């Protein structure tokens, strides 16, 4: 909170290449290039309500521009993001399911051939109680330098999470339409 007592959202977006430390600088086979988008916000709600909002397909459609996030919601189960018309835009697998703290999805774009060719990314959603709010951290990573997918999601996550925050706090979304370019 700032001095005025208002909750503030911090929106860091990191599109830089990150290389793990190498024991031998000449051994490049052990290095992995990575692109990452991180979005952090604070939502005035409970961890349980936020968790439900992230995993209930009917609720996701309200803030995710009509798209439903569908799964059996257990580790190893398939996951997909589906339009109201039934088109699967993204799909993958639930890697980790730890309600109401951590959700990890192996994520692959199905709509755009160029983004699909980049392969599988990992989306991690972490929920942490913070006073009367919940800190939500969305981290989307792909093992690829200069990923166009990460550029795309770095434009999408702020819109989706802004709608989620607004819906949970006020009962309505702030953005009605979203032109998905990926």
Each model region followed by its residue ranges:
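Hydrophobic ligand-binding cavity/cleft-lining segments
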Residues: 13-70
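A conserved amphipathic terminal alpha-helix motif
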Residues: 17-22, 142-182
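A short, structured loop/turn motif at beta-sheet edges
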Residues: 47-48, 95-101, 126-135
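Hydrophobic pocket/interface hotspot
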Residues: 50-51, 60, 79, 94, ...
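Short beta-edge strand/loop motif at the mouth of beta-sheet-based domains
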Residues: 38-39, 58-91, 177-182
């Amino acid at each position: 909170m700032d001095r005025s007592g208002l909750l503030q959202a911090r929106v860091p977006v990191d599109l830089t290449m990150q290389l793990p430390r190498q024991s031998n600088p000449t051994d490049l086979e052990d290095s992995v290039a990575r692109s990452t988008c991180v979005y952090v916000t604070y939502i005035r709600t409970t961890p349980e309500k936020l968790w439900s909002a992230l995993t209930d397909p009917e609720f996701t459609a309200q803030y995710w521009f009509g798209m439903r996030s569908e799964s059996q919601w257990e580790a190893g189960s398939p996951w997909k993001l589906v339009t109201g018309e039934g088109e699967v835009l993204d799909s993958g697998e639930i890697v980790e399911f730890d309600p109401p703290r951590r959700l990890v999805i192996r994520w692959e774009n199905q709509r755009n051939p160029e983004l699909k060719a980049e392969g599988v990314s990992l989306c991690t959603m972490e929920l942490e109680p913070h006073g009367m709010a919940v800190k939500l951290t969305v981290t989307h990573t792909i093992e690829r330098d200069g990923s166009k997918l990460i550029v795309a999601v770095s434009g999408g996550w702020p819109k989706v999470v802004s709608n989620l925050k607004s819906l949970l706090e006020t009962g309505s979304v702030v953005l009605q339409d979203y032109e998905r370019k990926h």
